[in-house]
Regions:
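Active-site-proximal cap/lid insertion segments
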Residues: 1-196
């Protein structure tokens, strides 16, 4: 269905369930378990969410990992004195990539970031609904993740990760021709492992 998004649908269903449960048993607590599809591949999200990140990853994964690490230190996520590990030898330096590779790989990360942000907004809709019911202070939210960054896209990312899993080579030229399809139902894309 044109415009369909699993995460929107899951939150719509969760909100509907909370409302129905509240109508049937208003004095009983509710339990909702919601497992969004994000941010596993395929990375599908509307263009407006991808556009929010246009150009934000052009500096490349070497600079990006340093910036993220600095933010984590400043926020206390990493203990003071922690040092950033070396980039793995099997991940190429961003500056060693061609301009076309950098353009494609930046775009792949823009799609991922848009998908993650869209998912966060959907979880936010659920939280706002609980607030609108006056149940926010009486609700426990538990957020868990089964994985962190993913290397499923391989060294060069993938227009269709099934290619990666089946050892089918993808060409930079073909993926550049399809760059505008990344994030759409036409693609089953994933970013290169340099971003992981």
């Amino acid at each position: 269905e044109q415009g369909y998004n699993l995460n929107v649908d899951l939150v719509d269903d969760a909100i509907g369930w909370i409302n129905r449960q509240g109508s049937v048993s208003p004095d009983k607590p509710f339990f909702v378990y919601m497992a969004p599809g994000a941010v596993h591949a395929p990375l599908h999200v509307n263009q407006e969410w991808i556009d929010k990140f246009q150009g934000q990853f052009n500096q490349g994964w070497d600079t990006w990992r340093e910036e993220v690490f600095a933010r984590q230190l400043a926020a206390g996520v990493m203990p003071a004195g922690t040092t950033l590990s070396e980039r793995p030898h099997w991940v190429p330096a961003w500056d060693s990539l061609s301009a076309d590779e950098r353009r494609l790989y930046s775009r792949m990360m823009e799609v991922y970031a848009g998908f993650l942000t869209h998912t966060d907004a959907q979880v936010g809709r659920l939280v706002e609904h609980v607030k609108s019911l006056g149940e926010f202070d009486n609700t426990i939210f538990v957020v868990m993740s089964d994985n962190g960054a993913s290397a499923e896209g391989g060294p060069k990312g993938s227009y269709n990760e099934v290619f990666f899993f089946n050892f089918v080579p993808e060409s930079l030229e073909e993926n550049l021709k399809r760059i505008d399809l990344l994030g759409t139902p036409e693609a089953h894309n994933h970013y290169p492992w340099g971003w992981a």
